[in-house]
Structures are given as structure tokens and as C-alpha cells.
Amino acid sequence: IEKSFHFHMVPEWEKEIIDYAKHPFWIGLSEWGDIEHIPNFYEFKHNKDVVDSNRVGFAARMETRKCPHFLQGIDSIFFTDVNDVKWWEKNINLDTSMWRTYNYKHEHLDMFMKQNWGISHSAHIYEPFGYSIFQAVDWGKIPILAHDWLPKYDYPFRASTPEQFKEQYEKICKLSLQEKRDILFPLREHLKQWDNKEQWRDRLLEIYNE
């Protein structure tokens, strides 16, 4: 994709907001710059076994930084705005013939997560936290991650281009159920360090009450 935009790509805009704020802080996965960092949180409520399916799921907005075009030609199921999918078809000439799309409604989230898909397209760039990644892992889906998301964690399936994504997808398709468990379960345990809602709440209250 030649044209993409995200505020993280405009340091001047970010600096202006930081300078304007009385008490700037960053809520995300990891520290960013010199700003005070308050880790975000995700509560693991499902802890599902691995879904042994090679269909890929995409549960995100159709932003350029989410890289939906990585899924051209791959059997996939989408949970997003159908009108945004049509925009990609019209303006980017995206081939969506291998996709099945469910229009996003929050109340249908559990229904979508229960569908028979076992691989999550989680290779999103400039991802500040990655709530949908945590969600996929919670529901037993093997994620394909971007190289810049939790880079210190030794994870075998990462992609930054459509070609890399397809390569990682094909590797996952060859795994046995137990091999998938050996990948997903340690990742889930690692992510549970961001499962502390009380810490997040208490630190925000301290700032708001200053």
C-alpha cells in the first residue's frame, strides 16, 4: 500500500498534543519515548483451547495500518464494516473473493469469535496495544504478528509484507494440534502480565485527582 496514514507517523502532531497536556501519559503495550507509561490491560475470560482450523480471521477496522490486503487469496473470515471492504475493492482493486464478511456489531463479537477459524491476522503496524490480538489469543486463535509488536518476545510467526504473511500462514497450516498448543499457550501466559485492571484504574485515578 503506497498511501497510508496514522498519527504515529506525524511526530509534530504528537509533540503538539504532549506540550498542550497538563499531565501527558501513554497507555499502551510498552513504554514510548519519555512519556509516563501506564500499561493497558486485557482480562482473559475464555482461555480457549486452540481452534484447529486453517481459516484466517480478521477482527479489526479496515485501516491501512491493519494491512487487510495481506489476506488476498487466503480463505478468511472478516468482522468489520462491510462498506469499508467495498471501499478497498473499489479503490485498491482488492480481490476479496476468498473472504466471508460479517458486518461489525459489538453485540455479535462472541458469535464471530466462536466461528471456525484458527489463525488471526494480527500483523498490524503501529499497534499501540493490540486488544484484538489479546482477544484472539484468549479465544484460541494462533496470531500472525507484526515484527514491531512485542519484539522482545521470541515468536515464530511474524510478517510485514503480504509475501511474508502467506509464508507464515503456510507454516501454521502444517502444524499439528499439539504444535499449535505449544505456540499459543506460552504466548497467552506471557500476555497475562497485562491482566491487571486494578493497577491501571488506580494509576489513572491518581492522575485525575491531582
Region roles according to the model:
Residues 63, 106-107, 119-132, 145-155:
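Nucleotide-sugar-dependent
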